[in-house]
């Protein structure tokens, strides 16, 4: 992991995405030392006790060896339907005022979720899925709406869970798009780029996103 982080830093990658739910990732990062990186971490799911979520965040800070993180995302978007969520969101803003968080945000999956957040909450950061085969947020205008409000956009799943880098072992779920994937591979081959380069360049060219 240390070598990976060194390689990332040497290539001007300065943001790390993690979560307490990602095994022991926060502990590993904390042991290596991540003072020179911007850290994005995520909340545990809200299951009735707001204080457990806040306590978990403080544990994340301790594990990471940080006094502040760049961003804290609500990991489970379904938490917004919880009766306690308004209390949690208020607590998150208190953490921001205390200087423990620079940006509050959400991890999302669908355009509808983004629309709901834009209509109901003020936030700084959002993580959204985006790739060659998933441009719903451009077509629906959500990316432009986020940009117009000054909300930082982080694109994830730019390789479609790795599918865009390896078409030889498609799961049953993705077999439905096998014909489209075959045409895509021909297009990529004709471009002279590798599968990785093509998928990465596609996302890099999207002006509304801030990071991938």
Region roles according to the model:
Residues 77-212:
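Beta/alpha (TIM)-barrel catalytic core signal, keyed to glycine-rich beta->alpha loops juxtaposed to Asp/Glu
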Residues 1-8, 49-64, 109-116:
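Short, acidic/polar
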Residues 29-38, 58-67, 117-121, 145-148:
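Acidic (Asp/Glu)-rich catalytic clusters
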């Amino acid at each position: 992991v240390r070598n990976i982080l060194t390689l990332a830093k040497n290539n001007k990658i300065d943001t790390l995405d993690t979560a307490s739910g990602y095994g022991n990732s926060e502990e590993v990062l904390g042991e290596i030392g991540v003072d020179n990186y911007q850290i994005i971490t995520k909340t545990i799911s809200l299951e009735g006790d707001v204080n457990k979520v806040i306590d978990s965040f403080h544990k994340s800070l301790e594990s990471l060896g940080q006094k502040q993180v760049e961003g804290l995302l609500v990991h489970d978007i379904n938490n917004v339907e919880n009766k306690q969520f308004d209390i949690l969101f208020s607590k998150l803003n208190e953490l921001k005022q205390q200087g423990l968080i620079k940006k509050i945000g959400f991890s999302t999956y669908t355009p509808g979720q983004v629309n709901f957040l834009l209509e109901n909450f003020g936030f700084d950061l959002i993580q959204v899925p985006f790739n060659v085969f998933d441009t719903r947020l451009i077509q629906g205008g959500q990316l432009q709406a986020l940009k117009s409000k000054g909300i930082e956009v982080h694109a994830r799943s730019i390789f479609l869970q790795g599918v865009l880098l390896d078409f030889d072992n498609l799961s049953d779920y993705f077999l439905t798009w096998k014909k489209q994937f075959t045409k895509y591979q021909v297009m990529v081959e004709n471009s002279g780029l590798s599968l990785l380069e093509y998928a990465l360049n596609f996302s890099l060219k999207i002006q509304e996103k801030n990071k991938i």
